[in-house]
A protein has these predicted regions:
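Hydrophobic alpha-helical segments and helix pairs
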Residues: 1-36
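Surface segments flanking catalytic/ligand-binding clefts of nucleic-acid enzymes
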Residues: 25-208
Length: 208
């Protein structure tokens, strides 16, 4: 991330950081949140390097446990259009496969039972994966979940991204969520500044 920070966009830096966290977590067995914490500490304590400010800005938006770059992209699209933050790859209560393994969702607002699932090509071409996805989604819809399934086409350009975000915003609103939808997406830089301001406000309030 250090080496790339001065050569890629802020969005790409967030996606790269989330991919690194997932890779380290899988290879080492460490919890993703601990890896993220270590990454933040490493960047904060590192001597100055070209791109350090960009790294620290990107880390305002990075989440642990995002399992694919396209999921990272989809999550950022939703945030840039004003949707509330969501949990990533979270387990759903009382929902398990026959093996006993808990069912999880890529991006989810658990309180409102709305979720987004990203399907790469392997979800379509791998019969086992396709059947597994179908079984999971049928089960979760029976439990009252609204599940929006997207592919790479849904986040390919600004128009597609806006339509995707509007669709999710509509479903959240129908479930009682207050959504401040932005037709024109914020830049990733604007989003990072907003997150930083919100974090500062939260810290001030908790200190009182």
């Amino acid at each position: 991330i250090r080496d790339r920070s001065s050569h890629v966009s802020l969005e790409e830096l967030v996606i790269l950081a989330e991919a690194i966290i997932t890779a380290i977590s899988k290879s080492s067995g460490r919890y993703p949140r601990l890896v993220l914490s270590s990454l933040r500490e490493f960047i904060d304590n590192a001597p100055y390097f070209l791109g350090k400010t960009a790294c620290r800005t990107a880390l305002q938006l990075v989440k642990a446990n995002v399992l694919s770059p396209k999921e990272s992209k989809a999550r950022l699209v939703l945030l840039r259009h004003g949707l509330p933050d969501a949990e990533v790859n979270c387990h759903v209560d009382r929902a398990m496969f026959d093996s006993g393994k808990p069912m999880s969702l890529d991006i989810a607002w658990k309180h409102f039972k709305v979720a987004v699932e990203y399907d790469g090509d392997h979800h379509r071409t791998d019969k086992h994966q396709w059947r597994r996805d179908r079984k999971k989604r049928d089960r979760l819809r029976q439990l009252g979940w609204t599940i929006i399934v997207i592919t790479a086409d849904d986040i390919r350009d600004e128009v597609a991204c806006a339509e995707f975000a509007l669709n999710v915003a509509r479903e959240l609103t129908l479930r009682g969520c207050d959504v401040d939808f932005h037709v024109i997406a914020m830049t990733v830089e604007e989003l990072a500044r907003r997150e930083k301001a919100a974090d500062r406000k939260k810290r001030r309030e908790s200190a009182v």
